[in-house]
């Protein structure tokens, strides 16, 4: 764009235009000014303060400012003198294109009165643009037989100025064959046409070079030139002709891209190349060429971009039809864009407050806003509304402005923030609407104390908590805001167990987090009662209290304590006595333990951790009772060691163990008798005696077996036969003499017993059975380990495999179950080679009986080497009263022959007051005890 031309009379013209605009505005109740374009920034437009009847110093007092409609600010107010000045350089062509008049409308807002004054400024065009050809060179082809006065359209010339400053005429360089003529259109610019003035002769001159000059009517005149190349063609006496000179069509603005608008058609009477017609656009701007496209072969015009009624409602297109040699015809295409309601209304908040006091009276103005719609007609008419449930209403102001005012009293405690939705709806079909939210805060007063969500709190803390750990948090809510809602927390002063409460817990005054200042112990402190106070920071401050109960939860921090059996002070292990005649389930002792914890942390369970003889004893899971799991055998060791574990149910569980020593014997004299018989024989004839005894026992067993078979055959009792066959077999275990200890070792063994036991000495039976107990509360430990005991029989004797059913007289209990490890071997499964040496004649048998009687007599007359007072069997005083000589049994009653139910002497005593299960004689002891 060319710079504006300065004229001597410019200032007088501006002053005259300003004066006329002022007088016209006063008469029409609207302020109007007129200025030329391209004025410098800050150029004077008009004295707006004077036209409003104000003084310059009142501008700031009344809040006078310019309010424009969504476009850039072109004008501004001079705060010193109140004059209206330009905010920058104004280009009329950019602002209004080629409109005959260019008017800029805006409003002057008086802020304190909320009054609007419309202002209109006309931008007057100046000659600041030079006419410009779209092409600097143009080739024109003319048939040599073209008639004089034929016209040929030339390229379009563009001048954005209007009036006299726009394109006015053309001038062609001197030539006798051609002249230029100016054509103008009602809705378009002027364009030149080349006029043929005479007859052409291609043979005389085939090419003409012309210079075309375009001039406007400004002062001074602006002009531009273009080169025209005229080529004379051979005869083509028919030009393309459009079916109509002007095509008109109306399309909606929401037409999809690529949709055909219309098709132009031109015909040529020639044939061949001279009759082939192509189409092209002429006299269109670059913007139009981006919106529409033309098919060069069919003449169909379609859209290549979206149409917008608000951007342009009318398009004029030039279409040219050209045949092969270059003859052409032109037509106009007039496209009218129909408005569619495709623009939603817009809401622009001009002024307003974001905060209002809750004591504001009804009618208080909150905001001023403007609504407009870019559509036209009914599509551009807009109405506004807000929800009726709100204490606000809309009042119509100047033009399309609205005021938002209150119509009821406000209460911040009920609603502290209003999001007022302003809905603007046009009257199009279908109607479009938009929503704008105006947020309004209600100012607060301190009229609400802090409140806790609960009337009381219960806090549960695990004991042994770390000091300083956060254990709970309280939160009080204050419906007020800002300073009135800042809550601080504190604890009421109190004492607990002689110490201030503040030494136990503390509270963060800002967050309300409660901290433990001590590590709590459930066994010492189980609960605390606190009062928490919440106060706000208003003036005056308000507060409230809440009760908080703190409960200490138990942790599994105490292991079970063994109360019984108690560990003696001398470090020895207590001894319990289990008679060999004890049946399965016999109560040997009971382990008693306690746990200082509570709940499941104090639930105790007992289990057998280790035993010298696995499967012999069991421990009640919940009772701690140590019972025999099976019948005691003579091969079982005299001394049994048990390790019982007591475990609680905490997480993780804690446990304690206790070691029990169980002496397997009917009574103390039995222990002495058994140990006395362990004297190894130094005579070589002992082995022969044992062999003879084994042979005798085998013979008796065979006779007994034959008798049983005959009896079963006579009675036809198959079941009884099976039972007797199982009891008929038996293995005899040997006992090498080199593995026994002397009787003198009994004294050291008995002196290790520090736990007092109650023994009975009237049992003379060796009742051995192997049932598997089935107590619901008993755990049987199957672990086994080997331990050398000086008072136990040899390992070879323990591992002797014999059928224990040979040694029992009572029928078996079918409710018991045998584990695979406890299941005895079959009858007669033992090798004969594994049996020991037994007395082989009557003399040897009598010698064995004499040895047993001598041991008993020695104990009776106090000559035993075990020591101790008379009649006490060498025991200490704590056992003396229970074991006098009158309780010493006749050991001959326990002597029997293996495989037979008969003893050497008849036994009158009965264990536990029960009769033997079968036979008239006493129950026999195992072969191991007989060998002893």
Swiss-Prot record:
Its main location: membrane. Residues 1-29 form the signal peptide. One of its GO terms (biological process) is cell adhesion. It is a single-pass type I membrane protein. One of its GO terms (molecular function) is calcium ion binding. The chain crosses the membrane at residues 693-713. Potential calcium-dependent cell-adhesion protein. May be involved in the establishment and maintenance of specific neuronal connections in the brain. This is Protocadherin gamma-A6. It comes from Pan troglodytes.
